[in-house]
Every structure is written in structure tokens, then in C-alpha cells.
């Protein structure tokens, strides 16, 4: 039965004792991050701690800690370091993304660029990357290589998104590739490092990495659906943000391929950023009624099935069941 004692970061792990151990693992990651970031010069501190103190889902540290439950040493100190490295990289990308997107709000608070300007936000993100690099050096050359490869994928995905879809590339294939690079790659690295440093077998580590990539892609698709389907800000941004910014997510791309009576109006609305609140509401209403939403949810279900296939081949231990609960949470939160 779901109780507060069994829930960690919104995910019902089913067992209060196991959940307490996982919660403690995530708390160790947060404590290490806090310790490392507070060592920065005071000229950095307010902007550097801005997003960290704003909270967030801590999805990536949670995935690291849960992946570590597959190995025989889930509480190894290196698992904590790996979780901190992954979350610092994630926070750094948020600072940089908000500058590129000119976002004004992040996690219910003014974004760093809105509060201090672009230069400060970029430098805060850079410092987070520097701190993550210093931490990962503790884990040895293989971990450094994994993180370097992940950096490359993150930047490639951002560049691919920034330059847009060329005429000879399918827009939906492009979208899914960008999501895998920008979101799936980092969660895949979380699974790989969590498995590695808990002593999981090589085969299990590879499976956890693949699982992370699939779950990361599903997580982003769910966020994109929430941005249209939800009346609240459960994705961490205002509903309709993607419409306002002119960002074409999976539900929009499918909706734009439809040929119903409302499609011409929807195409006109989604032709670029939408500033007018009434037009944002109109676009959201049309998107919610479009078959494109159902198609996007079908794709999300396919990724969930792929994740469950990977899970089924992991050992039947509490960690696997917890990862299955996380997959269910990822898919179900779009409502």
C-alpha cells in the first residue's frame, strides 16, 4: 500500500525499509553536492546555489542510486560521487538552456539569467561542469571517459536542436534523436555509473545504461505531453511553455501532420513563438483534441514496453522492482 514512507521523489517503491535506504542514498548525493558547491568563492555562491536550492525531482540521482541496487555494494561511496556528478551536469545544462531559450522561470522561481543576466548564468553553469569534472576524476579514467562521451552527446543534441531539421531528415526522427542525446544520454550514464560502482556485472551495467537511455527519452516525452495536457506546472515549467517558445515537441509534430478541420488554424498558431495568452490557450485546446496527442502517448507506451523488456532481464531483486516502479511513474505522470 502506498504510504509516505514508501515514496521517494514521487515514486512508490513499495517497501518502507528499502525506500528509507534509497532516500538516504539520494540524501548523500545532495549532501556531497552542497559541500562541494559551498567551497566556491563567494562571488559564485548565490548564482551557483540558485537552482540546487530550488529543489527539483532529483530524478537522475535517484536513477543512479536505484541502478546501484542491482550490484552487491549499493552504498559504495563512489555511487554517491557518481550521482553528484550526474546531477551537477544536469543543473549546468539547465543554466545554459535557459540562456539559449531566454527562459524567465525555472522550478517556480526566476531563472538565473532573468535574475542576474546571461553572463552570470553561463558562468554558473560552467562552474558546475568544472566541479563535476573534478569529482569524476576521483572515480578513475573509465568514469572520466564515460562522462566525456556524455558531454559530447549532450552538446551534439543541443546543436542538432539549435540548427533545426534539414529538408532530408524526418522531423519526428530528428526529435527522438535530440531527446536521446540531450536527456537519454545523461540518464544512461547514471545507470552505467550506478551499476559499475556497485559491482554489477558487465552485462548488467550495459543493460542499466540502455534502460537509462530509454527511460530518459520516455521522461522527456512525458514532460512534453504534460506541457500541453496539464493545467499545473508539474513538469517544472509553466503549461504551454513550448507553444510560447515555438518549440515543436512530439505531440505537436504529430498534430501538424493531421489534416482535420482545425489543422490549418493550428499550423498558423504553431508557425513560431506565441506571445498572446489567448492564442496559447487556443493552441493548447486544439492540441489536446488532436490525434497527435494520442499518437505521442502511444510512442511513450512503446518506450515503456522497451524499458520493461530491459528490466525483465535484470536479477529479481528489490532494485529491479524499484526501477520498474520508476518506469511506471515516468509513464503515468502525464495523466
Curated annotation (Swiss-Prot):
Its EC number is 2.5.1.85, 2.5.1.10, 2.5.1.29. Mg(2+) 1 binds at residues 97, 101. The keyword Transmembrane helix does not apply. It comes from Mycobacterium tuberculosis (strain ATCC 25618 / H37Rv). Mg(2+) 2 binds at residues 97, 101. Contains the canonical two aspartate-rich DDxxD motifs, designated as FARM (the first aspartate-rich motif) and SARM (the second aspartate-rich motif). The primary role of the FARM and SARM is the chelation of the divalent magnesium ion cofactors that assist substrate binding and catalysis, but it may also play a role in determining product chain length. GO terms for cellular component: peptidoglycan-based cell wall; plasma membrane. This is Nonaprenyl diphosphate synthase. InterPro entries: Isoprenoid_synthase_dom_sf, Polyprenyl_diphosphate_synth, Polyprenyl_synt, Polyprenyl_synt_CS. A motif (DDXXD motif) lies at residues 97-101, 223-227.
